[in-house]
A protein has these predicted regions:
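Conserved N-terminal beta1-alpha1 strand-loop-helix module at the mouth
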Residues: 1-45, 57-63, 67-71
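N-terminal small/glycine-rich loop or linker at the start of catalytic domains
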Residues: 1-21, 98-111, 134-148, 190-199
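Hydrophobic faces of well-ordered beta-strands that scaffold small-molecule active sites
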Residues: 6-12, 16, 42-46, 75-80, ...
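Active-site mouth loops of central-metabolism enzymes
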Residues: 8-30, 74-83, 108-115, 143-156, ...
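Glycine-rich, proline-tolerant flexible connector loops at the mouths of alpha/beta enzymes
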Residues: 42-67, 101-114, 142-149, 174-184, ...
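Alpha-helix-loop-beta-strand connector modules within alpha/beta enzyme cores
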Residues: 54-78, 118-136, 158-164, 186-204, ...
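Conserved anion-binding
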Residues: 104-162, 166-178
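Catalytic alpha/beta core domains of metabolic enzymes, predominantly
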Residues: 176-247
Length: 247
């Protein structure tokens, strides 16, 4: 295990989606991505192919994706929640797809209006249908705590991880502290268990809601995690986890 860490910058997606009020112009999003690229970042979540009624700020993701394809060496990930988003992402030439669901029933229902089994069944079909050469990252929200269901037991979260792992031997899996409630001990323990069972294929997506973001990143690193999400300026958060701010 090397000490090298891959930073995945999520502010163009996680940050922008949280902005209410006026629509952030496409050129502003492009300028943000260009600035991050100029700063040396080479991996970013740049948008989501979701319903513009649900998340209006992501309505121009196709245009943003087209711009990112002009930046040499940039790994651009777009999030897709369902078949419609998947089809739009593939049509737009996406080379990295981010699938997502929640480890808890309450958050999955609030965020996706589906049961976990319904989400998993559709995402499993999307994993199977992903074109060869297209990379996948599977994001599991609320691994540690849920705004609706409270503290998540390790076993519940890891049961879902086990099912996700079985879908594809190569895809990266992100374990998310969606609300920022996790403790370093909890993060370290879950990552140690995941790595012991399925190898070092996991990323950490944390939030700094209660000032524990950096400590939790350190705990994930100590447990062997080498892919960490960041958000420039600490902007962003989940629409159904009020107050959560990225680390």
């Amino acid at each position: 295990m090397t000490g090298k860490v891959t930073i995945s910058e999520v502010s163009p997606r996680d940050g922008i989606q949280s902005i209410t009020g006026d629509f952030v112009p496409t050129e502003v999003k492009i300028a943000l991505i260009q600035a991050l690229y100029d700063a040396g970042l080479r991996r970013m979540e740049i948008g989501s192919f979701v319903s513009p009624k649900a998340i209006p700020q992501m309505a121009d993701t196709a245009a943003v994706l087209a711009f990112t394809k002009t930046l040499p060496g940039l790994e651009s990930t777009v999030l897709v929640p369902n078949r419609r988003g998947f089809d739009a992402a593939i049509a737009g030439g996406a080379e990295r797809l981010g699938f997502f669901m929640s480890a808890t029933a309450g958050h999955n229902k609030a965020n996706l209006n589906r049961t976990r089994e319904e989400s998993f069944a559709e995402l499993a079909s999307l994993v199977r249908d992903t074109p060869k050469g297209t990379l996948i990252r599977f994001n599991l929200s609320c691994v540690f705590h849920c705004p609706f269901d409270g503290v998540v037991e390790d076993a519940e979260a890891l049961d879902w991880v086990e099912r996700i792992v079985a879908l594809n031997p190569d895809m990266e899996i992100a374990l998310a502290d969606t609300t920022g409630n996790a403790s370093p001990d909890q993060v370290r323990r879950v990552f140690e268990k995941a790595h012991a069972a399925w190898g070092h294929r996991f990323a950490f997506h944390g939030h700094d809601t209660y000032g524990m973001g950096v400590a939790n990143v350190a705990a994930a690193y100590e447990a062997g995690c080498r892919v960490i999400d960041s958000a420039a300026g600490g902007i962003g958060g989940c629409p159904v986890a009020p107050g959560a701010s990225p680390s």
